[in-house]
Design a protein with these regions (language model features):
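N-terminal localization/anchoring segments of enzymes in phospholipid and broader phosphate metabolism
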Residues: 1-537, 555, 559, 571-727
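Hydrophobic alpha/beta core scaffold segments
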Residues: 562-566
Length: 727
């Protein structure tokens, strides 16, 4: 990237943050700075064209969720606690919202420029996204034919200009048209939820992509032949998603699934927090529309970038338009039936998406088929639409294992999927429980219990990411599996508490939030503070905004401890501020895969302590969620985690460094490659062997009581269903 472009990137990333005199950065503005880094990937000429288009899609999707959740929360705060300032930046809710809206408009200008450039490059590569403002006669004739194909799927509703608008669902696209003859004025509301987002045809080797919303808008007079279409626009409403179970009246039977379903219905009907308009309306028409939507002008964004860019998936073209293929390595060196024997002697670390998640699925099947296995207990937060892990758990229950699934029904925007899976797993014979009333269970924790004669042994897995094979190929995550008995006992104690609706107790080996995570984190930071200039801290996480943790990191810096923070997203602490954070560095990697793993490292050499787990350094992870962390204690797993940290240190392609003013820049020059590419090469080629000699002796096990498994009921006809799922 040229020096001028880097300077522009620096300016765009920093000028919208809190004032330099504050050591802390407003959370919402820090998140917008992260999403800007995503948008900058869409502008990077080194990124293949269709991948740049994908980053543009991700940017818009991220922003929609941000408005639904964070601006929804801020809107409620502005109403309920308007005088309560943000403890980090001192900004009041209304001021925060105003600044977010300003920054969003600023970023929109960059988004428009990027889209224009991508569109031109697509055309040069044989994929023409039609512009109905300047369309050729042949393209218009072909488009008219496509319009005829979908015409019967369109269901316009026409109302008098003085009537209330019908309800516009969040995230759905509508065409709003103003109709009139003489003094009679009407409105047409046309939902597009029944038609595909795009269509296409080919002329002389050029693929013509027809976005359905502009297509229907262009041919609207053909649909409304009896009406006089004066003007029209494409409209999308983003509604507040800040709805909680506490907002839903209790049901007599206290059925949590029903309460969550009711909450989802309520969420769909919340007030708008943003409106997007594609197409120009006259000022009076625009004002009337916003009045009917009850949305202020400040919340409205007129854009020329299509709302839906999913047409990317239909574009062919040369291989150079996409990233080189990088498939997760399926073979990690173990065959089916070898996992238990290997893990009993060695801890196993897996790194996604460089390695496949299927070996973990194989482990569940091996447990299902092992006559010595008594039980499988697992926490489930987000699963794929057709989950291989859910099928493996169902299979295990059908084989007579006691399968306990803690399913968090409140995983935002995955609630319905989790409701469906809770019913399916119950039908399979699994015991299904839910999260705690005041704490979401966000941990990625699994424990498999076996009985050899009169002795029990356990295999425990802790992960940084969801048990989801789809996101397992899109996010960087880690999974650590061990047969250490103290880890198994801690995991069992955590599940025992959760079954009883209690917060898991402080653990001996694992860190279990909310009781163990922050205290252990603070203790180890204090340990490094005591070492002064010899102290070392390296943390890879997705976000940092907890004041107590940030103040402790400032103490580390003031004591001379070298602190490296690899924070993908929100980072509310400014590095390099003299007298405060001059020994702290902050960097962020945005690349091909979404950085999602968490590594906490304290010290170096033989004294280094290394942990992985599911939680970031946000208030919610430290205080309002159940999270699980496990220490890497074997030389092999520690070496692999240090490889990850070293790759991040050496990244000169996708890493951006945070400056004291809160802006982010890419380092110029120097040797180094993309950390993700380096780690793909390392982990995809890495294999273990069941024939490896046993690892160093494990700590002495804590005595345990024998476990009596509860028999699982099997519904009739389930075997036939299960065979169809896993075949």
């Amino acid at each position: 990237m040229a020096a001028k472009e880097k300077e522009k990137e620096k300016k765009e990333g920093g000028e919208d943050l809190a004032a330099p005199e504050s050591i802390f950065v407003n959370r919402e503005l820090s998140w917008l700075a992260f999403n800007l880094r995503v948008l900058q990937e869409a502008a990077d000429p080194a990124v293949p064209l269709l991948e740049r288009l994908k980053f543009l899609m991700i940017y818009q999707s991220n922003l929609a969720e941000f408005y639904r959740v964070r601006i929804g929360i801020m809107t409620h705060r502005a109403i309920l606690t308007p005088d309560k300032a943000d403890p980090l930046s001192g900004m009041l809710p209304e001021a925060t919202i105003a600044e977010v809206l300003r920054v969003t408009r600023e970023q929109q200008a960059l988004m428009e420029s990027i889209w224009k450039s991508i569109r031109e490059e697509l055309r040069a590569n044989g994929a023409d996204v039609l512009d109905f403002k300047k369309i050729s006669k042949v393209d218009e004739l072909m488009s008219k034919k496509l319009f005829g194909d979908i015409r019967d799927l369109l269901d316009p509703r026409i109302i008098d200009i003085n009537q209330a608008l019908p309800f516009l669902w969040s995230g759905e696209t509508y065409i709003i048209a103003f109709l009139g003859r003489g003094t009679e004025q009407k409105l047409c509301i046309l939902p597009l939820n029944r038609v595909p987002a795009y269509l296409s045809f080919e002329i002389d080797g050029c693929q013509k992509i027809v976005l359905t919303a502009p297509l229907v808008r262009h041919f609207l007079p053909l649909l409304l032949k009896k009406e006089n279409v004066l003007q029209s626009a494409i409209v999308e409403v983003t509604r507040n998603a800040d709805v909680f179970l506490s907002d839903v009246q209790d049901h007599a039977d206290d059925d949590l699934r029903q309460k969550v379903s009711t909450m989802l219905t309520k969420r769909k009907r919340e007030m708008p927090v943003r409106v997007r308009i594609y197409g120009k309306l006259t000022d009076p028409a625009r004002a009337l529309l916003l009045k009917k939507l009850r949305v202020p002008e400040s919340r409205v964004f007129t854009q020329n970038v299509p709302f839906d860019l999913s047409f990317r998936s239909c574009i062919g073209g040369p291989a150079g338009l996409r990233y080189e293929e990088r498939r997760p390595a399926r073979d990690i060196g173990l065959k089916k039936g070898e996992y238990f024997s290997y893990i009993e002697k060695h801890d196993l670390l897996m790194s996604f998406p460089f390695q496949s998640m299927m070996p973990f699925v194989d482990l569940i099947y091996e447990a299902a088929d092992d006559p010595e296995v008594l039980s499988i207990k697992i926490t489930l937060y987000r699963m794929s639409g057709s989950s291989k892990i859910a099928a493996a758990l169902a299979y295990a229950a059908d084989k007579g294992k006691d399968v306990l699934c803690l399913l968090e029904l409140r995983a935002r925007f995955d609630e319905q999927n989790n409701i469906d899976y809770s019913e399916m797993l119950e039908d399979a014979g699994c015991r299904v429980i839910y999260g705690l009333p005041e704490h979401k269970v966000h941990s990625k924790l699994c424990v498999i219990t076996r009985q050899h004669g009169g002795n029990l042994s356990r295999i425990t897995q802790v992960g940084t990411g969801n048990y989801n094979e789809v996101t397992g190929e899109q996010y960087t995550d880690l999974s650590l599996i061990t047969a250490r008995e103290e880890a198994g006992l801690d995991a069992e104690a955590a599940f025992a508490a959760l079954v009883n609706g209690e917060i898991p107790p402080e653990a001996h080996c694992l860190w279990i939030a909310p009781l163990s995570f922050k205290p252990r984190l603070m203790e180890l930071l204090d340990r490094e503070i005591a070492r002064g200039e010899k102290g070392r801290v390296a943390i890879k996480a997705n976000a940092l905004n907890n004041v107590e943790v940030m103040e402790k990191l400032i103490e580390c810096s003031q004591a001379g401890v070298k602190v490296e923070l690899f924070i993908r997203g929100i980072c509310s602490l400014r590095p390099g501020v003299p007298g405060m954070t001059e020994n702290i560095t902050v960097s962020s990697v945005v690349g091909r895969w979404l950085e999602h793993s968490r590594i906490y490292s304290f010290g170096e050499g033989e004294d280094q302590r290394l942990f992985i787990g599911s939680g970031d350094m946000l208030n919610r992870n430290l205080e309002r969620r159940v999270e699980a962390f496990m220490e890497a204690v074997t030389p092999d797993t520690r070496e692999q985690l240090n490889r990850v940290l070293d790759a991040l240190r050496n990244d000169r392609e996708k890493s951006r460094r945070m400056l004291p003013d809160g802006s982010y820049v890419r380092d110029e020059g120097g040797e180094g490659t993309s950390s993700q590419e380096a780690l793909y090469r390392y982990f995809s080629a890495r294999k273990v062997s069941a024939a490896e000699p046993e690892a160093e002796p494990q700590p002495v096990s804590v005595p345990q009581k024998a476990e009596t498994p509860a028999p699982a009921e099997k519904p009739r006809g389930f075997r036939a269903w299960l065979r169809s799922v896993i075949s």
